[in-house]
Amino acid sequence: MKTNDNYIEEVTAKVLTSGKYSTLYPPTVRRVTERLFDRYPPKQLEKEVRKKLHQAYGAYIGGIDGKRLEKKIEKIIHEIPNPTTDEATRTEWEKEICLKILNLHTSTNERTVAYDELYQKIFEVTGVPTSITDAGCALNPFSFPFFTEAGMLGQYIGFDLDKGMIEAIEHSLRTLNAPEGIVVKQGDILSDPSGESDLLLMFKLYTLLDRQEEASGLKILQEWKYKNAVISFPIKTISGRDVGMEENYTVKFENDLVGSDLRIMQKLKLGNEMYFIVSRL
């Protein structure tokens, strides 16, 4: 007779063998399967897991081809000659290259107008961190020329769900000779053990977490160990329309923090995104 764990493992394995879901982080698929297990009979469970994954991770599933992404990045790198002159010239080359790479993903594309001052403004409030954790990083590891220029020369760890994207980022960072302290890996902030760093980045992630599990964004902020965290929200739609997102997200986030041990140190608005710099009381 199959146990509950047997059913969960079986459904998780079936979902992960599907081409559409095969590059998704396995603990994420198992977590979703476990959450839905008591709600649906075994014969319906696999269908509901797929449905939930599509709802929660539609931006990743089917939207990322790691090999294609890697080729696009390689093309960008080879189109702009690598300078062999002074360090300042190389830094400007890295910034030009990385901005083009950051344009390849919707979330970082919207942020390219802000990178020149984003980390400097954050570090003015938090101090220069010795370590950064970037949860749900997407292509944000390629902002390294901007946070290193702002003084962050320690360890940066970025993680995201899609294996193909992470492998493409790893390979491309090596091609660019990025600092050794920059590490990317496959991971899920809701599935993995809590971590520790000076600065936790949750760019456009808080709302996505809450959509998966109620109040999980706040739960992560309370469980992780950090000196400061930066949580961002979009203030306009992808098409640039103002539909009240800034007010709605601000009210929601401020209300979430009521009664917690967290406080907002500063709110920044850069481009179509707002950033809340948070610390513990």
Swiss-Prot record:
**The EC number(s) this enzyme carries:** 2.1.1.179
Task: Give an example GO molecular function.
Answer: rRNA methyltransferase activity
Binding residues for S-adenosyl-L-methionine: 60, 105-107, 111, 136, 160, 186-187, 203, 212
Which Pfam families does this UniProt record tie to the protein? FmrO
Q: Which Gene3D superfamilies match?
A: DNA helicase RuvA subunit, C-terminal domain (1.10.8.10), Vaccinia Virus protein VP39 (3.40.50.150)
Which UniProt keyword terms apply here? Antibiotic resistance, Methyltransferase, Plasmid, rRNA processing, S-adenosyl-L-methionine, Transferase
Reactions this protein catalyses: guanosine(1405) in 16S rRNA + S-adenosyl-L-methionine = N(7)-methylguanosine(1405) in 16S rRNA + S-adenosyl-L-homocysteine
**What protein is this chain from?**
16S rRNA (guanine(1405)-N(7))-methyltransferase
The organism's lineage is: Bacteria, Pseudomonadati, Pseudomonadota, Gammaproteobacteria, Enterobacterales
